[in-house]
Amino acid sequence: MATLLLLPGDGIGPEVCAQVRRVAAALTPDLKVDEALYGGASYDTHGTPLTDEVREQALASDAVLMGAVGGPKWADAPRHLRPEAGLLNLRKAMDVFANLRPAYCFEALAGASSLKPELVSGLDIMFVRELVGGVYFGQPRGIEDLADGQKKGFDTQVYTTSEIERVGRVAFELARGRTNKVHSAEKSNVMESGLLWKQVITELHAREYPDVQLEHILADNCAMQLVRAPKQFDVIVTDNLFGDILSDAAAMLTGSLGMLPSAALGAPGKPGLYEPIHGSAPDIAGKGLANPLAAILSFEMALRWSLKQTEAADALLAAVKAALDNGARTRDLGGSLTTTQMGDAVLAAL
């Protein structure tokens, strides 16, 4: 029996994960769904955002789905014990190096985008973000006192050939099943790591994926083009920092952060890590206002990529589209449905 580990986390996480549990029970009754504390909720109970037991439970599962993590309540906790540290440590432990962050616009929501509907209608971009390297993990890092009384903050951006190659392969393989086009975004004009990134992707393309169209683009120009003409893109592969920024920018083209899922994948046969890209939204937590669709669509990605239940994934994606076509809207989409009522709409469509 396949196992899904739910880590609801903080803020609105438990509310949106409750809807995932309802959908899983209806769509995949044979799926074993476990649940554990994580993030700030774990810190409050166990003094750490990620216990050894939960880490081992995650590694033994077929897929892990998180709700949300963090909030101002834990802002004064030591950095290594903040909820977000639990997320980084779990990613590292699972070695999920490729972050898939789709930015697609459902036809029913084209009018909710910050851009004109004709620019985003039919939008379907897949970001492939390197997830366990780069400036978020590079050493040395820190804040030092200087002799003149000032302080110096520093981080280190580091990438190796193998780290770039493995995420590049994910992007090229995905492109073969889509429109056969990859953009690689970096800053090779000013960063040595960006120069290496461009070289490695170029060599990998020539050696293993000459059938895929490859274009290199500077990350700042990529940000501009996402606003100017986003439908020129299909698969965008980039590093940890730029992937974080660019995929968030693209998310708003779709109408709401509450709509977008993500997947973090490692080696074949290893569990994937799935989560909505929205935050914990502590200002609306417990009020029934959160949009659960990003979490539900994260479950759809888990069905597709880790649990290998493609038909169930297709049915769930169609149900979400049908619910939106029928006018189901939470507050972030200009409607009035509660979190549970949006879950009801998806279940009715199923």
UniProtKB/Swiss-Prot annotation:
Q: Which reaction does it catalyse?
A: (2R,3S)-3-isopropylmalate + NAD(+) = 4-methyl-2-oxopentanoate + CO2 + NADH
Q: What does this protein do?
A: Catalyzes the oxidation of 3-carboxy-2-hydroxy-4-methylpentanoate (3-isopropylmalate) to 3-carboxy-4-methyl-2-oxopentanoate. The product decarboxylates to 4-methyl-2 oxopentanoate.
Q: What is this protein called?
A: 3-isopropylmalate dehydrogenase
Associated pathway = Amino-acid biosynthesis; L-leucine biosynthesis; L-leucine from 3-methyl-2-oxobutanoate: step 3/4
List GO molecular-function terms, semicolon-separated.
Answer: 3-isopropylmalate dehydrogenase activity; magnesium ion binding; NAD binding
* Quaternary organization: Homodimer.
Task: Provide the E.C. number(s) assigned to this enzyme.
Answer: 1.1.1.85
SMART domains, alphabetized: Iso_dh
Family as reported in the entry's similarity comment: Belongs to the isocitrate and isopropylmalate dehydrogenases family. LeuB type 1 subfamily.
Q: Where is this site: Important for catalysis?
A: Y136, K187
Q: Which cofactor does it need?
A: Mg(2+); Mn(2+)
Localisation per UniProt entry: Cytoplasm
Gene3D superfamilies assigned to the protein according to its UniProt record, in alphabetical order:
Isopropylmalate Dehydrogenase
Q: Where does NAD(+) bind?
A: 71-84, 279-291
Where is substrate annotated to bind? R91, R101, R129, D220
Any one annotated GO CC term: cytosol
Query: Which keywords does this chain's UniProt record carry?
Result: Amino-acid biosynthesis, Branched-chain amino acid biosynthesis, Cytoplasm, Leucine biosynthesis, Magnesium, Manganese, Metal-binding, NAD, Oxidoreductase
The cofactor binding remark recorded in the entry reads:
Binds 1 Mg(2+) or Mn(2+) ion per subunit.
| HAMAP family reported for this sequence | LeuB_type1 (MF_01033)
**Keyword presence, Nuclease:** no
> Residues that bind Mg(2+), according to the entry?
D220, D244, D248
Gene Ontology terms describing biological process: L-leucine biosynthetic process
